[in-house]
């Protein structure tokens, strides 16, 4: 069971994060509760999107406005059916997997890759200078 412990989400965009979407039931339950509490937009994010019960439920909830986007990584197979959904965003992790493999092959530390603080500060500096962020 899920118990809501936060403050008001009314009018706010909310991000639901979990390690895995198997059937998706738990995330859908949370999304329904957030919409009941008048969240403006609901985004579902997961590392591994398995969608073991198919996409019908996600299609329905997207069409009814209960979820706005679903984001998962390409660390597991993504069907063409999933990739074609208007609400689905593929988070490409290829670059990071390649960097991890490269660091391991060169006996280098992974801490720089795993700690995002430096990258965040560099992006903020670019933003402050008015540069385009890609």
Predicted region positions:
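PRPP-associated nucleotide enzymes
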Residues: 1-134
């Amino acid at each position: 069971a899920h118990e809501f412990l936060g403050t008001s989400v009314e009018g706010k965009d909310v991000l639901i994060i979990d390690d895995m979407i198997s059937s998706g039931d738990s995330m859908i339950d949370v999304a329904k509760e957030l919409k009941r509490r008048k969240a403006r937009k609901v985004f579902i994010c997961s590392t591994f999107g398995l969608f073991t019960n198919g996409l019908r439920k996600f299609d329905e909830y997207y069409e009814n406005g209960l979820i706005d986007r679903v984001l998962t990584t390409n660390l597991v197979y993504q069907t063409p059916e999933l990739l074609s959904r208007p609400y689905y965003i593929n988070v490409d992790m290829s670059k990071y997997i390649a960097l991890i493999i490269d660091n391991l092959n060169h006996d280098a530390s992974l801490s720089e890759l795993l700690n995002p603080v430096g990258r965040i500060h560099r992006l903020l500096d670019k933003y402050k200078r008015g540069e385009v962020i890609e």
